[in-house]
Amino acid sequence: MAAAAAEQQQFYLLLGNLLSPDNVVRKQAEETYENIPGQSKITFLLQAIRNTTAAEEARQMAAVLLRRLLSSAFDEVYPALPSDVQTAIKSELLMIIQMETQSSMRKKVCDIAAELARNLIDEDGNNQWPEGLKFLFDSVSSQNVGLREAALHIFWNFPGIFGNQQQHYLDVIKRMLVQCMQDQEHPSIRTLSARATAAFILANEHNVALFKHFADLLPGFLQAVNDSCYQNDDSVLKSLVEIADTVPKYLRPHLEATLQLSLKLCGDTSLNNMQRQLALEVIVTLSETAAAMLRKHTNIVAQTIPQMLAMMVDLEEDEDWANADELEDDDFDSNAVAGESALDRMACGLGGKLVLPMIKEHIMQMLQNPDWKYRHAGLMALSAIGEGCHQQMEGILNEIVNFVLLFLQDPHPRVRYAACNAVGQMATDFAPGFQKKFHEKVIAALLQTMEDQGNQRVQAHAAAALINFTEDCPKSLLIPYLDNLVKHLHSIMVLKLQELIQKGTKLVLEQVVTSIASVADTAEEKFVPYYDLFMPSLKHIVENAVQKELRLLRGKTIECISLIGLAVGKEKFMQDASDVMQLLLKTQTDFNDMEDDDPQISYMISAWARMCKILGKEFQQYLPVVMGPLMKTASIKPEVALLDTQDMENMSDDDGWEFVNLGDQQSFGIKTAGLEEKSTACQMLVCYAKELKEGFVEYTEQVVKLMVPLLKFYFHDGVRVAAAESMPLLLECARVRGPEYLTQMWHFMCDALIKAIGTEPDSDVLSEIMHSFAKCIEVMGDGCLNNEHFEELGGILKAKLEEHFKNQELRQVKRQDEDYDEQVEESLQDEDDNDVYILTKVSDILHSIFSSYKEKVLPWFEQLLPLIVNLICPHRPWPDRQWGLCIFDDVIEHCSPASFKYAEYFLRPMLQYVCDNSPEVRQAAAYGLGVMAQYGGDNYRPFCTEALPLLVRVIQSADSKTKENVNATENCISAVGKIMKFKPDCVNVEEVLPHWLSWLPLHEDKEEAVQTFNYLCDLIESNHPIVLGPNNTNLPKIFSIIAEGEMHEAIKHEDPCAKRLANVVRQVQTSGGLWTECIAQLSPEQQAAIQELLNSA
């Protein structure tokens, strides 16, 4: 007994040390604690919690540790305890809750009870702790306020506590919550019951019937939101934000009241900023999650806009602002930043059709206000709504731009800054139309603003706006301004370099260096004349700017040098390439000493990749130096944590952590530092593999080992995309090592790629993975997939197609929704486009499999056949029919003559769809009929005969050559050629040929153009009388066809077809008179094209 007491005493000391501010003591205590067996931990912790004479901090610490133990290691610890110990723990916890007098301690024990209850619901939903439920019911109707609080706290923490009995107890739960929400005497009970109600609704987010059943709790809930805010407690308001985010439909019956309350709280300046911003967050969140529902309440939206603008006016006067050299991060808690962000999101959520007419007048009034804060807010508001109101603002952009440019001359520097901001934002939001319309005014105004020497913040922001402008500016528009731009940028750079040396200021210089880089990037080879003006100074900065506070400047200068090098090309850059490489190598050697957050790292990594593009194969020599740090950065592992709500309260986003709510009181946290750098590094590895090919072979093994696991790196989309992109490129690099090495590498990636197609949650990333997988199969060819691969892939593709049809049905349901409007239709169209894009990737994968495996793969394909047949049904949307036909085109092209087995499914639709209203469907059908003639066996002959008049009808229709129809028409012309070439006995070739010649050349569809030119060569080389005409009278027409093909770049000079065409021309050249006659009938452009063909083929 004494030994146990001594051990418990030791444990109290340990708890004290776990709370120690001394890092060494605390670390040692954590190690000791970790080594105590789980069952002993439970005993010690419970004993500490029970002991009311122990220090308060130690008891609270014990409660937190016990909850964490049950949360993270329940299965290892609890089931192994003897059943009497389990029973004792359960009754002990309920006893402590009833006896505990300290409110905060009671809460912590309730958290333990909730955690235990969560783990005691079995797989069938049975609650294995009936005494816990009984305690809940007894306590909630107790006279003791502490016990009522405890019951609500447990229910809030674990709303699923009723398990499979929830439906049975639904009315009881509702009564319990209503009763507590009406408790006028105890605000804490009202607050807790409101939070518990929200938690319960959120836990049942897909149960629409339950929303209706609980709708009458909403008025009481909203009252609790209001009351708690005025008691300086925003927890219920946060619950309302969560409901707006996750289950906005629950709010529908009382949406007006919800919005009115949020509006009132947002506008009440007696509340603190955080509460007002949270109230605004309710409305803004609804504009994102229930836009159609909110659009019906235009009165609220109209009242919310002035509130956001009023917040944006809430700015501090700051004497040092204009010449601060360090850019402090925006104060994200400030009303001004919150208002601007809310406005941006609301404009995107609700759309410009609603928002712009409401806000336009407000902004115009603000811009005329004598107080600078209003003018600043008005301009920032214009910047914020550009993305959401894009379509509506485009129509009045001229007056907006003219007005904004006036404010670049405003007497107040912060207004001039905001005007730069608006110009920069519009240059991005409305590119390239903005640049095309306003280049003259904008460039002149920004260059003038950059001369504002007394206000470097304004100067720097004008340079930043210029960067935005030039990044998206068409090269041809920028060229006329180059002299003037360069002159200004150079003089400012020289001046700011002096200031850096004299005063140490660098803010403007950082931006100007990037402006130079951006101009060079757009101007490309036209920047050559200015190269020598900038390069010496830029090299000087990299050599000398070695102090810690100049790291960003140095990084940006490295970027600038590499972008200029890429712009001017290898020949001009070579004079400095060796110097620059030495500078970079020196930086690289110091790389290992750099701190992880050093801004130079990502600039360095990107610069190396640009140097690789400039130097090509010569870059290979630098790989040993570059690859170490690059792999180190690409291998960064982010800090992650699984936290429950209690732990969350001690964390904040300011520490660089971001959280995702997983429901059930759990959150997933990730420290985001280093993620962008990791993504950049992975993209650079892709760049090296692409540029260096076999020169990168030495590194393929380590890179593939890094990249394959990154297909599951769900913290950053860019990393997964780079991982996927790298796979086929790495296989190409590895080819030189021979088939065995290549196959080993493919085996290492294949499983992971197939699994990633099945599990990838983001459609943009998924399409990249599918595309890469298809490319890999093309590289590896026949035999690269085993039976297990085929089985898994078949299941995944089947699931993707089924999901495609299911999503279409869901969209039809949404079109019947009471809130359906034209903006909803726009977002449904976007979803549809996403789905179709995935369908194109399914087609890509099947194409690569058919082209590699031929007819051997048809038995496997049969599991997908009903779904592909469904795609080409007449009632399906045109993209479905287009891609369904493309898949059958591949079956015919690669699996004939065996493909005829499936002809009953696709032949009739294919013949029918040649005349479809949609050009994309016509094109896919026509291509199919062409490959049917080319590759199909004799069984297809009668269908070639049937196809011909249908194809001719499309070609001869009046609008067959318009932009949207031309590709389909050219496929029809090519198909007619293939029928004549490969199935000549199915049609009257003599009759069709003159028509076919009159339709040539093809110039849009380059692949089909080559096919038709090859057939034309066959006919000419065999001296076909109809083609050449009596006494070669058709030759001038043939020359004209060849010349047009050359002019439209339909003839690739490296293609054997080009040599055949050139030989036709040369033969005519030898018979003088005929040559003169042919050439005489060509225009000067056509003559030049014939000469170009002769020179190059």
UniProtKB/Swiss-Prot annotation:
Role of this protein: Functions in nuclear protein import as nuclear transport receptor. Serves as receptor for nuclear localization signals (NLS) in cargo substrates. Is thought to mediate docking of the importin/substrate complex to the nuclear pore complex (NPC) through binding to nucleoporin and the complex is subsequently translocated through the pore by an energy requiring, Ran-dependent mechanism. At the nucleoplasmic side of the NPC, Ran binds to the importin, the importin/substrate complex dissociates and importin is re-exported from the nucleus to the cytoplasm where GTP hydrolysis releases Ran.
Importin N-terminal domain location: 28-99
Output the Gene3D superfamilies linked to this UniProt entry: Leucine-rich Repeat Variant
Name the predominant localization: cytoplasm
Residues with the N-acetylalanine modification: A2
Q: What is the similarity comment for this entry?
A: Belongs to the importin beta family. Importin beta-3 subfamily.
Q: Mind listing the GO molecular function terms for this protein?
A: GTPase inhibitor activity; nuclear import signal receptor activity; nuclear localization sequence binding; RNA binding; small GTPase binding
- Which gene does this sequence derive from? IPO5
What protein name is recorded for this chain? Answer: Importin-5
Identify the keywords attached in UniProt to this record, alphabetized: Acetylation, Cytoplasm, Host-virus interaction, Nucleus, Phosphoprotein, Protein transport, Repeat, Transport
Tell me the organism's taxonomic lineage: Eukaryota, Metazoa, Chordata, Craniata, Vertebrata
Task: Provide the positions where the record notes the PTM Phosphoserine.
Answer: S827
Name the species this protein comes from.
Homo sapiens (Human)
The cross-references to PANTHER family, in alphabetical order and at most eight, read: IMPORTIN BETA
Positions of the HEAT repeats? 5-38, 43-77, 95-122, 130-157, 167-201, 210-246, 254-289, 298-350, 352-386, 390-430, 432-472, 475-523, 525-568, 570-615, 617-692, 695-737, 741-780, 787-853, 856-895, 903-935, 943-983, 990-1021, 1032-1067, 1070-1093
Under the subunit heading, UniProt states: Interacts with RPS7 and RPL5. Interacts with RPL23A (via BIB domain). Interacts with H2A, H2B, H3 and H4 histones. Interacts with CPEB3; this mediates CPEB3 nuclear import following neuronal stimulation which enhances the interaction in a RAN-regulated manner. Interacts with AIFM2; this interaction likely mediates the translocation of AIFM2 into the nucleus upon oxidative stress. Interacts with STX3 (isoform 3). Interacts with SRP19. (Microbial infection) Interacts with HIV-1 Rev.
GO CC annotations? cytoplasm; cytosol; Golgi apparatus; membrane; nuclear membrane; nuclear pore; nucleolus; nucleoplasm
Q: Which InterPro entries match?
A: ARM-like, ARM-type_fold, HEAT, Importin-beta_N, Importin_beta, Importin_rep_4, Importin_rep_5, Importin_rep_6
